[in-house]
Every structure is written in structure tokens, then in C-alpha cells.
């Protein structure tokens, strides 16, 4: 009988300090998350310097809590996995330096993990991958379609050419007077409104799987500006509904088209915006109509957390991916560089 593999994972790419212990890539023994939302709310967004300071304050206790909750020790851990990027450099370095210190002190392998690979592998913690598959990544910093023919095989077939979908949500939220984080509040308002504003659906070229949300964002802002100039009433619920319907229609349409083009039967959704109820609802409908298996993680695994880093880190560890003590953080990082081709 083979020995269980225990991965200690650390995530600090943005405004959550998180540590987790993952068993055999599938079982969450602990997943401690220290959120900074309240600290950033008054600024209307994440302030990098504030985020870094909070990571410094919380990283040690977060790791200790993860180990204690998992009822394990560093001696029993097989490897330390940590987010290398993309993310805020100052924030990333707090987690990376903690991981390097532990790996050095306890003579454990150090495994660098791509943040988006982590989001993708959050799905595998709840429902096994069925290859080949298509991954739709929707978050504050990323909007991508990634084709996977096997574990650690990442081919980006589409990505945003300007704003990520989460950025558009936050900007629209601020425009209609909602506080940070805006995405969940827009989603909640959208359930109460009607689609009364004609906002654009940006499909780009016929065969393109790329996305663009800057035009939609500008259309919403301009529409509200014009209404104010004319002293006409603005109904926030209807703005939220019209905006969200425009976003969701494009995301769902391109995801389904990608699945059909690449002949895959499982669509997984990853990233913070994957917890959006409107998006989840429309994806369920579309996937049922096209006989595609849909996999979306629980909301707690959609937002940044270390369990997802441990899930991806397990397969990277098994594939022999390692880093030395020169590991650094990167604000931008190509997920395709983390692909492992099987012989």
C-alpha cells in the first residue's frame, strides 16, 4: 500500500493569507483563510502595501493553524507548495519567503504553483477531472479559456484583451454606488432587476475565443452619465441586471462554443466570479442543453485559498516540479509554462 502524500500549501497572491494541508491531492485536511476585505473596503479596492503588511502579520499563525487543524507536523509533510504568481509582488513574496524558510528548515521539496492552475484544480477537490476538458477562468485579474487534455496540460485558447470580468464588475459596482467588493453585490442586485438597458455583447472575430469587457464597462458608465445629465432616474437593479446579462451571455456562449470546437464533455469553471449565481444558473442551463458535464466548486473554493494551491501542487510534486531557494514572485506568469507533457 502506497504512502499518503501530504502537501503544505501557502497562498498570498492578493488579499487573502491562506495555508492548507492536502492529502493525496484530493482531501482537504485543513484550509485556513485570513481575509483582508474589511481593511480594503474603505479604499474601494486592494491596496498592495496594506495587503503585504497584513500578510506579514498573519502568515505564521495561519500556517500554524493549518498544521494544527490537520493534526500533522512539518516532519510529516512531503512538500511545501506555494503560489509563485501571478499576483501582487509584495504579497507573493510573503508567502514565498515563508515557504522557502520551511522547506529549508525541514529539508522539504519546494513546489512553485501557478495561481490560475490552483483555481482550476479547486474543482478536482470536489469532482474528478474527465479529460479532455475545458476550463473557464473568471476572476478579478483573469478571464481565460484553457484546454486540458491531461493533468498539468494547459493550452490557453482564449483570454481577455483588456479588462478581466471581475474588474468590470468592480468598476460598474462603484459607478452605481456599491461598496467593495462589488461583484457579489452586483450579482445580488441583478436578481432583483429587469434587463431594461441595451448594453453591448462583445463577441470579437467569428472564430475567436478571446474576451473584451472594456467596451461594456464604458457603455455602462456613459449610459449612467447621460441619464444623470438628463436628470432621468437611474434604477441600480436594472443596471446590474442588464450588465450581468451582457457579461454572462458572452461567457456562456464562448465556453459552450469552445467545448464543442475541442470536442470536450466537461466544462469546469474557476475563479472568484465562478461563485456568481447568475453565471452559475445560465451555465447549468446551457450545459444541460448541450450535454456537457458542468463542474463548479463550492463558493468557498472559488475565492483565493491555499487548498487549491495544494491540489495543483500535489500533481506538480508528483511530476517532479521543484524550485530552489532562488524562487521569486512574478506579477505576470504564463500558465502554459507550467505544462508537463507526458511521454
From Swiss-Prot:
Its cofactor is Fe(2+). It comes from the Bacteria. It holds the Pfam family TsaD. The keyword Metal-binding applies. GO terms for biological process: tRNA threonylcarbamoyladenosine modification. NCBIfam families: gcp_kae1 (TIGR00329), T6A_TsaD_YgjD (TIGR03723). This is tRNA N6-adenosine threonylcarbamoyltransferase. It comes from Staphylococcus carnosus (strain TM300).
Amino acid at each position: 500500500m502506497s504512502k499518503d502524500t501530504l502537501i503544505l500549501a501557502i497562498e498570498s497572491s492578493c488579499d487573502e493569507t491562506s495555508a492548507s494541508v492536502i492529502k493525496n491531492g484530493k482531501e482537504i485536511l485543513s484550509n485556513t483563510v485570513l481575509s483582508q476585505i474589511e481593511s480594503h473596503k474603505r479604499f474601494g479596492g486592494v491596496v498592495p502595501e496594506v495587503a503585504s503588511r497584513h500578510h506579514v502579520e498573519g502568515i505564521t499563525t495561519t500556517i500554524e493553524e493549518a498544521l494544527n487543524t490537520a493534526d500533522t507536523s512539518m516532519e510529516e509533510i512531503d512538500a511545501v507548495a506555494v503560489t509563485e504568481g501571478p499576483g501582487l509582488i509584495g504579497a507573493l513574496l510573503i508567502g514565498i519567503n515563508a515557504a522557502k524558510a520551511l522547506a529549508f528548515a525541514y529539508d522539504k521539496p519546494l513546489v512553485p504553483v501557478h495561481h490560475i492552475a490552483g483555481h482550476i484544480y479547486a474543482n478536482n477537490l470536489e469532482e474528478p477531472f474527465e479529460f479532455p476538458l475545458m476550463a473557464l477562468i473568471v476572476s478579478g485579474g483573469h478571464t481565460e479559456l484553457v484546454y486540458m487534455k491531461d493533468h498539468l496540460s494547459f493550452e490557453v485558447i482564449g483570454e481577455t484583451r483588456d479588462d478581466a470580468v471581475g474588474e468590470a464588475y468592480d468598476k460598474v459596482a462603484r459607478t452605481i454606488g456599491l461598496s467593495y467588493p462589488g461583484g457579489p453585490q452586483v450579482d445580488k442586485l441583478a436578481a432583483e432587476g429587469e434587463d431594461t438597458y441595451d448594453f453591448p455583447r462583445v463577441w470579437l472575430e467569428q472564430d475567436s475565443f478571446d474576451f473584451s469587457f472594456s467596451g461594456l464597462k464604458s457603455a455602462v458608465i456613459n449610459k449612467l452619465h447621460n441619464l444623470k445629465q438628463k436628470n432621468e432616474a437611474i434604477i441600480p437593479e436594472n443596471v446590474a441586471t442588464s450588465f450581468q446579462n451582457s457579461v454572462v451571455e458572452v461567457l456562456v456562449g464562448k465556453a459552450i462554443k469552445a467545448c464543442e470546437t475541442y470536442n470536450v464533455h466537461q466544462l469546469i469553471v474557476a475563479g472568484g466570479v465562478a461563485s456568481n449565481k447568475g453565471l452559475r444558473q445560465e451555465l447549468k442551463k446551457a450545459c444541460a442543453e448541450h450535454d456537457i458535464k458542468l463542474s463548479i466548486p463550492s463558493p468557498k473554493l472559488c475565492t483565493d485559498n491555499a487548498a487549491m494551491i495544494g491540489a495543483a501542487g500535489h500533481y506538480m510534486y508528483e511530476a517532479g516540479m521543484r524550485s530552489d531557494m532562488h524562487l521569486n514572485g512574478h506579477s505576470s506568469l504564463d500558465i502554459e509554462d507550467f505544462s508537463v507533457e507526458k511521454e
